[in-house]
Regions:
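Walker A/P-loop
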Residues: 148-168
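Conserved RecA-like ASCE ATPase "motif II neighborhood" in helicase/translocase motors
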Residues: 218-246, 254-265, 545-548
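Conserved RecA-like P-loop NTPase helicase motor core
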Residues: 256, 514-608, 612
Length: 660
């Protein structure tokens, strides 16, 4: 064994040790650390422990631990998992509404004081402490820089990710590239100028790659774009390959889609250190963390044993590699709740059909949390380290407002639904005879017609002629806007389709309610100018915005009420929309309203978002998943939807008789 090999092995051991160190973490726990509870029935607390039985109405003492609770009964002390505990016991009423913050992992500085100390000294020499003035910002900066390959910065919105990205780019050795959405490039340049940083370059062309600065900025759109139309595969990312040591991806959750052009461009850079900065890193499902972890931490490693296309690393491989699972298969077995899936989906987690419950398997929930602990540095707005310096309002998510149908709208919806129903039954029968599963892509494409019939009926082809009057949902939205304005608030309405927003705007104009329609139909520069003039520095009473243009980098604390005209299939879209208003400058309590047409697709989408949000919170923020509710799958919803058509027809006939 040569000296060179020994040193290489030592370096690998140090890398594994430092990459495997969990980031410092505080989490919010419901209840209190220790409390009294009463048994609902006589039952076994733990099948693996002798004597772990409790009598009905027996009072016990419960102490919270990582895997659930330690329960002190008359017969001794026994371990009890979270779901079993709440199925057997009723906590004291005083405990239900209580909560506390708990340190799950200590700051890395406690284990590596010299290394973190050196990084803090370097940051001070660079003057970074002059603009990262809050303790948690410097602490997190040094913890992120401590990781030799990279990490995910999961700071929630408005905690200072832009300045953190600049600071990290300066602190790390070598040239750094900050990649962001095109509409945010000018804001990042303004921030650099404000901080007095001159050694930076905005990369727009091949020529710019020849003379790079310490900090370099490029948009995702330019990075993936071909230099010359004649060579479509020769992108700007390929010219930057190996010229950049560190890459920082703002709103890098888009890497969850490994097949997108943006993701391919980022992987192409070949940077030594890779960072993702995103307040909602998983756009939809907790499983999307696998692709993000592979990008920042590598694959098939001791600290990140999963892989996207390779194997799964475990200790038993020292003895035998027989029956070694792939990284995807093992990740799916542990964390993904599937009832069935095609091989295409199992191989990629992105393409192909499946029936999935948005939930991390309860048996592996603690394992998932331990896996992400060294990969993501998480901060939320309400935790003590943040609230020492700044406070954020907690948005109130109101129960959905169920809206009754207007007769003509209901007739249109039923016609569209029947067309979908006939196609669906025929498609299901045909695929069954062929021994194939249903085509999810085709179903979603057809179902889009039902979405439009419910939310944008004037655009439905074949039936839209003459149906230009306001729907009951649009009337409910306008009434809600007026109600909020009467309270002295400035609401923002989110919708998927700009047609809806223009219809609402026309009606508000008749009422002399000033409003701004903010959609992708205008250029970035034009709509930003309107936003500044009429909302930020103006007095327009209402903002009508499409989901697509308000996802990130938009601060709207001057608005203070949220109305979602329709739901989104992506939890990130709704979360980002709501949190545009949640800023330190927000002076009002923010309420969020959701409009649902009774029995329509709105109800399924609302359920889907709820489950996705709870699953992501359970994995990242130690939230609690509930087993008390059953998830209504897409096909079950479809059949319930189809079976409701005769009832809808009866309602139409009854309404017609009343009208006569």
């Amino acid at each position: 064994i040569t000296r060179q090999l020994i040193e290489s092995l030592k370096a690998i051991m140090v890398e594994n040790k430092t990459m495997g160190v969990p980031f410092g973490r505080m989490v919010f726990r419901k209840g209190t650390p220790e409390f009294k509870a009463t048994a609902n029935k006589m039952a076994l607390i733990n099948l693996a422990q002798k004597g772990a039985v409790v009598s009905k109405n027996e009072t016990v003492t419960a102490k919270r631990v990582d895997k659930g609770f330690v329960v002190q009964t008359r017969r001794g002390e026994f371990a009890c998992d979270h779901d079993t505990f709440f199925g057997l016991f009723e906590p004291d009423k005083t405990v239900v509404d209580a909560g506390y913050w708990e340190e799950i992992y200590p700051p890395i500085e406690r284990m590596y004081p010299k290394e973190i100390g050196r990084l803090k000294t370097k940051a001070a020499q660079l003057g970074i402490d002059q603009w990262l003035t809050w303790d948690y910002q410097i602490e997190d900066l040094c913890e992120l820089a401590f990781k030799p390959h990279g990490a995910i910065c999961g700071w929630q919105m408005a905690l200072g990710k832009s300045r953190l990205a600049i600071s990290l780019a300066l602190l790390l050795n070598g040239k750094s590239l900050i990649v962001l959405k095109s509409r945010l490039v000018s804001e990042m340049v303004n921030e650099l100028n404000l901080l007095g940083i001159t050694d930076f370059k905005v990369v727009k062309s091949k020529a710019d790659t020849e003379h790079l600065g310490k900090v370099n900025i490029v948009s995702y759109e330019r990075l993936k774009r071909a230099i010359d139309p004649r060579t479509p595969k020769l992108t700007l990312a390929k010219f930057l390959r190996k010229k950049i040591k560190n890459v920082l991806c703002d709103e890098g959750g888009l890497l969850a889609n490994h097949f997108s052009q943006q993701s391919r461009a980022l992987w192409c850079l070949g940077a030594k250190r890779k960072y993702i900065l995103d307040g909602t890193p998983c756009p939809n499902y907790p499983r999307e963390m696998q692709n993000l972890a592979a990008f920042v931490a590598g694959q098939e490693r001791f600290y990140q044993p999963y892989s996207m296309n390779g194997g799964f690393i475990e200790k038993r491989l020292f003895n035998s590699a027989e029956f070694q699972p792939t990284g995807r298969d093992e990740f799916t077995r542990r964390y993904v709740t599937l009832e069935w899936a095609t091989n295409e989906f199992l191989n990629s987690h992105e393409r192909g059909a499946k029936r999935e419950v948005p939930k991390i398997k309860q048996a592996f929930l603690q394992d998932y949390r331990a896996w992400v602990a060294p990969i993501i540095k998480r901060r939320v707005q309400q935790e003590p380290a943040v609230s020492r310096y700044v406070t954020f309002p907690i948005p109130t998510l109101c129960d959905p407002i169920n809206v009754d149908w207007e007769i003509d709208h209901l007739l249109l919806y039923v016609k569209t639904a029947e067309e979908f129903a006939n196609w669906y039954r025929q498609h299901a029968k045909q695929r069954g005879e062929e021994g194939k599963g249903l085509s999810l892509t085709m179903i979603l494409a057809r179902l889009e017609a039902c979405f439009k019939a419910a939310n944008v009926p004037s655009t439905v082809s074949g039936y839209g002629k003459g149906f230009q009057s306001l729907t009951s949902k649009e009337i409910a939205c306008i009434n809600l806007i007026k109600q909020e304005i009467d309270k002295g608030l400035r609401p923002i309405v989110f919708a998927k389709n700009p047609v809806v927003l223009r219809r609402l705007s026309a009606e508000l104009n008749k009422m002399n309610i000033s409003n701004l329609v903010f959609t992708g139909e205008d250029t970035i520069a034009k709509r930003t100018e309107k936003l500044n003039q009429r909302i930020r520095n103006g007095s327009d009473q209402v903002m009508l915005a499409s989901f697509g243009v308000t996802q990130d980098g938009l601060n709207l604390p001057m608005l203070n009420s949220v109305i979602l005209f329709n739901r989104s299939f992506k939890s990130r879209a709704e979360f980002q929309a709501i949190y545009r208003l949640i800023r330190p400058q927000q002076k009002s309590e923010v309420s969020c309203y959701f409009l649902h047409l009774k029995g329509s697709i709105d109800e399924y989408m609302g359920q889907l978002i709820k489950w996705k949000t709870l699953a992501n919170e359970a994995g990242l923020d130690y939230g609690e998943q509930s087993d008390k509710e059953d998830f209504v799958h897409f096909d079950a919803f479809v059949y319930r939807f189809l079976n409701s058509i005769p009832e809808l027809k009866e309602r139409i006939d009854a309404l017609k008789k009343l009208a006569a």
